[in-house]
Amino acid sequence: MADLAKIVDDLSALTVLEAAELSKLLEEKWGVSAAAPVAVAAAGGAAPAAAAEEKTEFDVVLADGGANKINVIKEVRAITGLGLKEAKDLVEGAPKAVKEGASKDEAEKIKAQLEAAGAKVELK
């Protein structure tokens, strides 16, 4: 048990970079991956309907940039962190996804921001 306690102490003293390097070395030595396995669940008869009602992730899609594209471009830049050209291309290329996999609250907030700037927005 003394050896295990020493290992725990040594691991606790590692920096984040050292822990990441240790993880890579162990993956190589043991021939494994640290990626989490994806579980596949069997769908029941009512499961798809329940999943549609309880949707937790939304895609915020810019349907139309509207008449005031400059304000919409500013909002897209603020939301996504894109550069000016990328945000302009996104707005002018509507319909395009502004944010994918957003929570319901975040998606509603983004939708409100874009609509306040004059854009037409859909949540999918």
UniProtKB/Swiss-Prot annotation:
Gene3D superfamilies according to UniProt = 3.30.1390.10, Single helix bin
Organism superkingdom: Bacteria
Keyword entries, A-Z: Ribonucleoprotein, Ribosomal protein
**Which positions are tagged coiled coil?**
none
Check the record and name the SUPFAM superfamilies matching this protein. ClpS-like, Ribosomal protein L7/12, oligomerisation (N-terminal) domain
Q: Which GO terms describe its molecular function?
A: mRNA binding; structural constituent of ribosome
Q: Name one GO biological process term.
A: translation
InterPro entries membership: Ribosomal_bL12 (IPR000206), Ribosomal_bL12_C (IPR013823), Ribosomal_bL12_C/ClpS-like (IPR014719), Ribosomal_bL12_oligo (IPR008932), Ribosomal_bL12_oligo_N_sf (IPR036235)
Query: What's an example GO cellular component term for this entry?
Result: cytosolic large ribosomal subunit
Q: Which family does it belong to?
A: Belongs to the bacterial ribosomal protein bL12 family.
- Protein role: Forms part of the ribosomal stalk which helps the ribosome interact with GTP-bound translation factors. Is thus essential for accurate translation.
**Entry's HAMAP family?**
Ribosomal_bL12
- PANTHER family on file: 39S RIBOSOMAL PROTEIN L12 (PTHR45987), LARGE RIBOSOMAL SUBUNIT PROTEIN BL12M (PTHR45987:SF4)
Subunit details: Homodimer. Part of the ribosomal stalk of the 50S ribosomal subunit. Forms a multimeric L10(L12)X complex, where L10 forms an elongated spine to which 2 to 4 L12 dimers bind in a sequential fashion. Binds GTP-bound translation factors.
- Name by which UniProt lists this protein: Large ribosomal subunit protein bL12
